[in-house]
Design a protein with these regions (language model features):
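Thiamine diphosphate
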Residues: 1-160
Length: 160
């Protein structure tokens, strides 16, 4: 393998069942379009993308056309990909297990404003407050980052 390598040891279990795979290469600063759609675009950043994928599948089963984009990088943002999202849908939901203030969702809102995006954007992430101790699932529920809360936020956007 040529180039830098990162080994990550997250808390808890991973989501990849078959992990003995060749290493994947990611183009620096490029997002990955996991699913195309036009009613709503869900932009996820980080491991919360697994929950986002489940929500997308659930909404697709209900007949909604939902795109899912894995941003991969918070910086630099893939502005070309985001401009394509702005052109293809009027509803965007950003999801990250990071701070709302100054996070990926904020950067997307800033770009949307610069691009005169007229659609609706809802950001989900960690509030700028003390989060009580608890299990990761309890903390996600508290912050509205559990799968059901993400689904409800997406559904509200779709029906507005």
């Amino acid at each position: 393998w040529v180039g830098p390598v990162a080994i990550r040891y997250p808390r808890g279990a991973g989501s990849v069942v078959e992990w003995r795979q060749p290493m994947q290469s990611y183009a620096h600063g490029r997002a990955r379009v996991l699913r195309e759609g036009s009613s709503l675009a869900i932009l996820s950043l980080g491991p919360i993308g697994v929950s986002a994928s489940h929500v997308v599948e659930r909404l697709q089963a209900e007949g909604y056309s939902v795109a899912h984009i894995d941003l991969v990088f918070a910086k630099p943002l893939d502005e070309a990909c985001l401009r394509a999202v702005f052109a293809s849908t009027q509803k965007i939901l950003t999801i990250e297990e990071g701070c709302l203030n100054g996070g990926g969702g904020s950067a997307i809102l800033q770009l949307a404003m610069q691009e005169d995006y007229a659609g609706r954007i809802k950001t989900l992430g960690l509030p700028d407050e003390f989060i009580p101790h608890g299990t990761p699932q309890e903390q996600k529920l508290y912050c509205g980052l559990d799968e059901e809360s993400i689904y409800q936020a997406a559904k509200r956007l779709l029906t507005q």
